[in-house]
Design a protein with these regions (language model features):
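Auxiliary alpha/beta "docking" domains used to position bulky ligands
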Residues: 2, 15-182
């Protein structure tokens, strides 16, 4: 799938709609800096245009479940998932992944739709229908990262594949919760 550029790009379209009449810069000790409220509004509006159903921002804090992860690894419960044991500190603290990180943007994307449900008797998990969601969402994240770069931000985007404990951040900002699997 080709990335959209120019006038049809949700980034440029979204920014024109959102910023019309509002200043994107505020004075901070005599220096013009991006207004966090405008950045958040822009981000959430563009994320909706890209098909995300939820957009929330959490503080980039160390995971409250860090100790549980360390114990889980110590006990060898990660079985053949050796990557889990590499740099566990990075999994529990966003600042270890991106120096100076202050916020974690959490997004949700609904993949349950009648069009995705196959006819017939058998059933499989809805996320397994259609194309692999990783590639689809990674492209959408690239568009959002482009928006944040316009404001001078440094960021990293992951689709359940990075070292961050995304459940903790999603729960902290009200976009998710911890189920029985912890």
């Amino acid at each position: 799938m080709k990335r959209r550029r120019g006038a049809g790009n949700p980034i440029s379209t979204g920014l024109k709609k959102i910023l019309g009449g509002r200043g994107a810069l505020v004075h901070d000790a005599g220096v013009l800096t991006p207004d966090p409220a405008v950045i958040k509004d822009s981000l959430c509006a563009v994320s909706r245009q890209l098909g995300f159903s939820g957009c929330r921002v959490a503080r980039a804090e160390k995971s409250p479940h860090a100790e549980k992860l360390f114990q889980w690894l110590e006990r060898g419960w990660h079985a053949g998932m050796e990557w889990m044991a590499r740099s566990p500190e990075r999994r529990t603290d966003p600042a270890e992944v991106l120096l100076g990180c202050r916020s974690v943007i959490c997004l949700s994307y609904d993949y349950d739709s009648p069009a995705m449900r196959p006819e017939g008797e058998g059933s499989i998990c809805l996320y397994a229908h259609g194309k692999d969601y990783h590639g689809i969402l990674e492209e959408k994240l690239a568009d959002l990262q482009e928006l944040l770069s316009i404001y001078g931000g440094k960021q990293k985007g992951y689709v359940d594949s990075g070292p961050v404990m995304e459940r903790d951040h999603a729960e902290a900002c009200g976009l998710g919760w911890r189920g029985k699997s912890g």
